[in-house]
Design a protein with these regions (language model features):
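Short, glycine-rich nucleotide/cofactor-binding loops
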Residues: 71-80
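Short flanking/linker segments adjacent to small metal-binding domains or redox-active Cys/His motifs
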Residues: 79-82, 334
Length: 377
């Protein structure tokens, strides 16, 4: 059924830009209700979380006692991943910091990564993608006119981290992902990045190159690394009293970290996609999800969030320069970029995908394996 009336949650700021949103009799949406019922149990809970964290750290140290590193840590130059590095080092872990370089990093992000690694005294490895392949693949998603423009990055990151972990005999990957800043994100806004059939279908239709070196991470790869190699993710920030504002202060004062703008704007393409392409073309404003999470976590008031949403998601004075930069990186003309952006919006459903199979697979997995808060996927 097509929704014909606009509605916004009375507690958070999620609205009918999520086609799957629902509301209870009090006007609260399914997202903030789910946060209360589920996510609040998966965030910091005082001494209980501390005890669980102590057990996790002991397990990581024990598993890596005979290796140079006891964990791999993905870093992007953003707040969450840099603070996760700070937390890991403070807890006595020996991480190998790994950055997946897709060619779109801002200068600020690169400096942040190097400063954090140097000041914490941890080894840092940059995994550089083949730019020609990656550029062609990401341009294919842009031409496909779907919201999942960042799927190539989203799938390359876990692929890279798992490969590096396996190469170094490491069993744990530390992630900066957390429920305080990312507890709410509508599934309708971004289709499953692990659907390799979907990725390959997009590339076959719109791409010009064969993907010979691009690292994918589909369900079979995930099963291999998880069940055969025994590699697990650990979300440290869910076990500490994590405040993004306090984390920023800490990083700035102790590690020379510099702010780069909005959430995930450490990447030039992510900034362009999330602040301009998604809101303008698809009516998707990621700020709503971020602010709604922060409201539910008690870190932002709804009034402040609504005030922020009154501002444009992109800088009108800078957008022309951003478009020129993106077109140049993709090696297309500004006119070609404008034509692509103006093409009708489409959905993953318009292309071959494995949604039905993945649904069965994930349901089976949940039945067989008991979900654990500390170590997932």
């Amino acid at each position: 059924m097509v929704r014909t009336t606009y509605r916004q949650c009375v507690r958070c700021v999620m609205d009918t830009s999520d086609p799957d949103i629902s509301f209870d009799d009090a006007g609260r949406c399914n997202h903030c209700c789910a946060y209360e019922e589920r996510t609040s149990k998966l965030t910091y809970r005082g001494p209980e979380s501390q005890r669980e964290l102590d057990r996790i750290i002991a397990r990581i140290k024990r598993a890596g006692r005979n290796s140079e590193y006891d964990c791999v840590l993905g870093v992007s130059g953003g707040v969450d991943s840099c603070y996760a590095a700070y937390a890991a080092k403070s807890l006595g872990l020996r991480p190998l910091a790994v950055h997946m370089d897709n060619g779109w990093d801002s200068d600020t992000a690169v400096r942040n990564i190097k400063n954090v690694a140097a000041r914490l005294g941890i080894d840092y490895q940059s995994y550089v993608l083949d730019w020609g392949e990656f550029k062609d693949l990401q341009l294919s998603f842009l031409k496909a006119s779907v919201p999942e423009i960042e799927t190539p990055t989203d799938i390359a990151i876990p692929a890279t981290l798992h490969r590096v972990a396996a190469e170094n005999g490491v069993k744990f990957i530390i992630s900066g992902g957390n429920y305080v800043t990312e507890g709410i994100l509508p599934k309708a806004w971004h289709y499953d990045a692990k659907d390799v059939r979907y990725l390959n279908a997009i590339q076959r239709r719109f791409g010009t190159r064969k993907l010979s070196s691009f690292p994918t991470f589909g369900y079979w790869s995930e099963a291999y690394f998880k069940l055969i190699k025994g590699i697990r993710y650990v979300y440290l920030l869910n076990y500490v009293a994590y405040s993004k504002a306090e984390a920023v202060k800490c990083l700035e004062n102790e590690l020379g970290w510099k702010n780069y703008g909005g959430k995930h704007h450490e990447s030039r393409i992510t900034a362009f996609v999330q602040s301009y392409v998604l809101p303008v073309k698809f009516g998707i404003d990621y700020r709503r999800a971020t602010l709604s999470t922060q409201i539910c976590a008690g870190q932002v008031s709804r009034e402040d969030a609504l005030e922020q949403l009154l501002r444009s998601p992109f800088d009108s004075a800078a957008i022309d320069g951003d478009k020129e930069y993106v077109a140049k990186k993709f090696e297309i003309t500004r006119g070609e970029l404008e034509t692509i952006l103006a093409s009708p919006a489409r959905s993953y459903r318009d292309y071959p995908n494995a949604q039905r199979f993945l649904g069965i697979l994930y349901r089976t997995y949940r039945c067989v394996f008991t979900p654990r808060r500390a170590v997932t996927s």
